[in-house]
Every structure is written in structure tokens, then in C-alpha cells.
Amino acid sequence: MIKRRINADELELEERVVQINRVSKVVKGGRRFSFSTVVVVGDGKGHVGIGMGKAAEVPEAIRKGVEAAKKNLIRVPLSGTTIPHEVQMEFAASKVRLLPAAPGTGVIAGRGVRPVLEMAGIKDVLSKRYGSNNPINVVKATFKALSALTSLEEQARMRGMTPRELNLRRMRREPAPQEA
């Protein structure tokens, strides 16, 4: 399956800085300071990307992060205002679990998870973060979880069903038919 790269110029992307971190390198003459940023971009309609930027000045680090995020865009399948199914993913020591929620619930998420979900256009979702709360790892785990989502149509195709049959089974919580 070949993934097509999403053209960022065709989308109206918003950007949000998740973290700005001052880092230092110790050299013979003292410390050299620079800045590291984590940036999330998205159009609020199912496209989201994350990027990291490093530079001597904050605006330059943010610009580099935005450029990296635009090169790293993915399409997130939405089911109305929420996600199509539960997903759990980990990155390093951070684990993120995302659950679909009823309309009107809102984005129940902490720092690191919330900006990624909001930039993707997800309005109703429950989330739980386990393990490390390092913002970089949490953002990457969330991004990985969103990229693992499959649409209702794709799930039905994989199971040899129509989306309507799959949805009806979910609503009734019927077990899959057993073959003799």
C-alpha cells in the first residue's frame, strides 16, 4: 500500500506550538544555548502533522518545526465528530489510549494529546495517557495512534461486509457469525 504525500499548500493549516525547550551545549568557552520546539499543524478537517525544530532563536525553531510538520501530514478518518474506533499506541515510555465519545462530550485530553486531536478536527474523544508525560513522546504516541485509525468503510471491506452491516452489528454488539 503506497501512501500518497499530502500537499500542505492545498490546505488551510493552523499551527500550534506544544513545547519550547531551551537546550545548551557545553563548549570550551561556556554554554551555547539553542531552542527546541514541538509544533502541530492541522486544518481541523482530518489532516494533522507534527514536527520538531531546533535553532538558536525561538521564531526560527518554530518555523523549522512548522516546515517539518507540513512534510509529515496524515489523513485522520473521522466518524462524525469523533474517531471510528478505540486505539492505543505507545512511543518510547509514553502510552496513549483514545476512545470514541458521544457528540457533545468534547476533547477530554491532557497536555500533548489535546493539540494533536484539536488540530485534526476531532471534537469528541476520551483519552488517557499512561507512563511518561514527556510532551515529545506523548505527541508522537498520539500521532502514531491517529495514523493507525481505519475508517468504517475500510474496516467493512477488510471483513467482507458492507459498512451498514458493520455499523448494525456494532450497535447491537453482536458477535461475529461462527462457521461450523
Curated annotation (Swiss-Prot):
Q: Does the keyword Mitochondrion apply?
A: no
Record's keyword terms, sorted:
Ribonucleoprotein, Ribosomal protein, RNA-binding, rRNA-binding
**GO biological process, any:** translation
Q: Which InterPro entries does the entry mention? A: Ribosomal_Su5_D2-typ_SF (IPR020568), Ribosomal_uS5 (IPR000851), Ribosomal_uS5_bac-type (IPR005712), Ribosomal_uS5_C (IPR005324), Ribosomal_uS5_N (IPR013810), Ribosomal_uS5_N_CS (IPR018192), Ribsml_uS5_D2-typ_fold_subgr (IPR014721)
GO cellular component assignments: small ribosomal subunit
Q: Which SUPFAM superfamilies match?
A: dsRNA-binding domain-like, Ribosomal protein S5 domain 2-like
The residues covered by the S5 DRBM domain are 13-76
Report the GO molecular function annotations: rRNA binding; structural constituent of ribosome
> PANTHER family this protein is in?
MITOCHONDRIAL RIBOSOMAL PROTEIN S5
Give the multimer and partner information.
Answer: Part of the 30S ribosomal subunit. Contacts proteins S4 and S8.
- HAMAP family the UniProt entry points to: Ribosomal_uS5_B
Give the domain note: The N-terminal domain interacts with the head of the 30S subunit; the C-terminal domain interacts with the body and contacts protein S4. The interaction surface between S4 and S5 is involved in control of translational fidelity.
What's the stated role of this polypeptide?
A: With S4 and S12 plays an important role in translational accuracy. Located at the back of the 30S subunit body where it stabilizes the conformation of the head with respect to the body.
Q: Which family does it belong to?
A: Belongs to the universal ribosomal protein uS5 family.
Protein's name in the database: Small ribosomal subunit protein uS5
Q: What is the source species?
A: Roseiflexus sp. (strain RS-1)
